[in-house]
Amino acid sequence: MLISNEWLKEYVTIDDSVSNLAERITRTGIEVDDLIDYTKDIKNLVVGFVKSKEKHPDADKLNVCQVDIGEDEPVQIVCGAPNVDAGQYVIVAKVGGRLPGGIKIKRAKLRGERSEGMICSLQEIGISSNYIPKSFESGIYVFSEAQVPGTDALQALYLDDQVMEFDLTPNRADALSMIGTAYEVAALYNTKMTKPETTSNELDLSANDELTVTIENEDKVPYYSARVVHDVTIEPSPIWMQARLIKAGIRPINNVVDISNYVLLEYGQPLHMFDQDAIGSQQIVVRQANEGEKMTTLDDTERELLTSDIVITNGQTPIALAGVMGGDFSEVKEQTSNIVIEGAIFDPVSIRHTSRRLNLRSESSSRFEKGIATEFVDEAVDRACYLLQTYANGKVLKDRVSSGELGAFITPIDITADKINRTIGFDLSQNDIVTIFNQLGFDTEINDDVITVLVPSRRKDITIKEDLIEEVARIYGYDDIPSTLPVFDKVTSGQLTDRQYKTRMVKEVLEGAGLDQAITYSLVSKEDATAFSMQQRQTIDLLMPMSEAHASLRQSLLPHLIEAASYNVARKNKDVKLFEIGNVFFANGEGELPDQVEYLSGILTGDYVVNQWQDKKETVDFYLAKGVVDRVSEKLNLEFSYRRADIDGLHPGRTAEILLENKVVGFIGELHPILAADNDLKRTYVFELNFDALMAVSVGYINYQPIPRFPGMSRDIALEVDQNIPAADLLSTIHAHGGNILKDTLVFDVYQGEHLEKGKKSIAIRLNYLDTEETLTDERVSKVQAEIEAALIEQGAVIR
């Protein structure tokens, strides 16, 4: 946003230099990126009056002009501009003058004719060709109003000015207008802000007699209003208005279009001017575009519309693409006499999608995208009516034709002086705080200690108490707040939360087991999004992914861990042991946020123990991976059980579900050989646990158990069972009948082969007995052992 100091003075008067103002604004959080001085590098530039023009005797394209520059005698200047003529007021660079680019003006002879100065174009005095009125693009600038020869040309052009260029953050859309900036400056200097004139002399004729407005979807268009102005005269706008537009980076067109742009910059409220007679009906209908509907915009481009686009129509045909660009046949032309002025509120998301899809970014669309101030919609239209009456001889019809609701102009937020002072660490009185809010243009209501701040709609960045605290600190001055130690109501010693403590314990266990922690992307390809998922739900896909490999939110940590293992193995690091604690995401119903669940996953491949002179090589296998998982359960004081399972992507015979309190909380298994081969991996084992589920059950500590005072007893038992019976089922039966003296069990041998029937296997299990209160006797242990054996026989086992 470009802010002219000359224009700013119309609303707020301060006694300070522009450089100081820019510094103060920057210190409050609005960065002034540049300070543009239009007088820089310019010297001896005056207004001249061309008294006569004659053709150069030796050059067809040159003219010899006698120019009055306010001195005793006119000066002779040779000029090659095609539009120079007698009777014009022009810009003259005198001899000894200087122009941008280091150009110095000297006396010269051009084809034998003396030339004492230079008649200038706007481009030659530093104005970008992008902003020069088209009538002066290829020639000198000619004043449209009489001037006094010899006066300062920059003053006559309203260019003796300095312009601040703001680098605004998206939340400060209020500073995208002169009035919004004026409120900010008035607050900084504790002075009043004067708003511009908006009252017109209206005709007795009502706009309601000539126009109706209908909104079909108020969710997309909450409010639409229009006013009508008759008998406008299309001509160039005043010099001062053209200059302000040029300094703001907008090319002047004519008085009607310029007034629309001027009010846009003044209020931050985009307007659109329609040629009333070209609309083709007395109704305006605002609706969603029809599928396949087309319209030609002001840039003479035919646009194919989507149903998500908002269009302004005459009841049948689109006459404007809402908030983005007008239509060609209803635009204001030189012959236009009657004007319809549009002021509206459009859905920011719809405008952003339309403007980006069609690559039609404009001053208007950028403001609609950020949200506009409801308080200024009607006021901006009234301002345009006043300017059309004043500078286009327009006749303003009374009444406003509107549909929809403007919505609230203010948002009340309650706060106390104590809350503000505790946050910024400085004592300000309630009166001082209220004064700052009033400086910002915020009305306040006081009820004992509570200050109710009525935040105007132009400040959409202020929604909570902390935003108000920031405003107080900004306006008071960050540099003026003394440095103090923070004050706390209650001081507590720092410590880890219960979850942080448990998470740290798990990480220590895994790192102690030789695993390295990995952190991988939350985004995966759409194909991998549901791989290894424990809850097969619809994928959550990005609307505009940067790549196909990162198009969806993951439902498992394993796809990227497998990728990481493959990456390491390909680079000769063949012994890979990784774990990750991270979030996975599961979709819910339409309009609901997805579930975010924390998982713990691991992958192991290669050798667990490297072959050294004192150690034998130990390759990763299922039981090693299971041992890692069991160490996690022990650390969290949990008891896992395992159940054979078939899971896509894992070996069909070497995979198990992990259960906690009879609920599946994870799985463990060998990577399917085909998947392993696809990733250039040898035998690889993975596990995945619902970490949130573990945290919900884990007490996080282990009860102290004293060292046994009495000796224990061990008994071994060998069982012949069907080969399909898992050892876990046998152990479950043993523990169910072992009473309180059976402490633990250990499978120490499994045999299949010679001396056993086909389809059978032999399992040897050691049972450890202990009573913490007394010495066990053989009779007591034998009785329990007999009960266990009877239960096993009933299960189909044969005691060997």
Swiss-Prot record:
Keyword set, alphabetical order: Aminoacyl-tRNA synthetase, ATP-binding, Cytoplasm, Ligase, Magnesium, Metal-binding, Nucleotide-binding, Protein biosynthesis, RNA-binding, tRNA-binding
tRNA-binding domain location: 39-154
Cell compartment(s), UniProt: Cytoplasm
Alphabetized InterPro entries for the sequence: aa-tRNA-synth_II/BPL/LPL (IPR045864), B3/B4_tRNA-bd (IPR005146), DNA-bd_dom_put_sf (IPR009061), Fdx_antiC-bd (IPR005121), Fdx_antiC-bd_sf (IPR036690), NA-bd_OB-fold (IPR012340), Phe-tRNA-ligase_IIc_bsu (IPR045060), Phe-tRNA-ligase_IIc_bsu_bact (IPR004532)
GO molecular function: ATP binding; catalytic activity, acting on a protein; magnesium ion binding; phenylalanine-tRNA ligase activity; transferase activity; tRNA binding
Stretches that traverse the bilayer: none
Protein name (record): Phenylalanine--tRNA ligase beta subunit
Organism, scientific name: Staphylococcus aureus (strain USA300)
